[in-house]
């Protein structure tokens, strides 16, 4: 066996918590970029940084490339574990009360077209304090509400009738929305 290599199997996945789904009337590339924008929006607020610090997350600031790249992109409370553009993004995190993953999957919606955006949460909550934390986060519906809000934000961003192309600045963007003619 070479140094640094182990033949141990990967750890089993964390226990399933929930999955939320939303249909998006846009192509998969637009939904991928919208998901990245929605994550940036949700985790760029000072309250997200304060919360990540309060519960003891290793990652409590946003950083790295956008859209997310595995091992290089972080959000408060999360690090990007894997990214398969434009189909799957897995974020992982850990703090004093929980270890968790949040996996976003983008599937073609049949037969009407568009994209099915899914958010799957897996987590463990060790010990009595972890159990109390689970009750506070899951039992109150807070996690479900925030997940649905994030998915709705991604849908609204992806379905905008006009938006800048990735990497395009406001100065380079056309003055009118597609389909409009100047007056």
Predicted regions and their residues:
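Short beta-strand segments that buttress and anchor functional surface loops
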Residues: 66-68, 89-95
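Hydrophobic pocket/interface hotspot
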Residues: 31-35, 80, 119, 154
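A short, structured loop/turn motif at beta-sheet edges
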Residues: 25-29, 82-86, 106-116, 156, ...
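Intrinsically disordered, low-complexity segments used as extracellular stalks/linkers
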Residues: 164-168, 172-182
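Beta-strand/loop substructures that line and gate deep hydrophobic ligand-binding cavities in soluble
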Residues: 96-148, 154
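Short aromatic-glycine motifs in intrinsically disordered, low-complexity regions
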Residues: 60-72
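Short, surface-exposed coil-to-beta transition loops
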Residues: 17-19, 75-76, 98-103
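Hydrophobic ligand-binding cavity/cleft-lining segments
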Residues: 1-61, 183
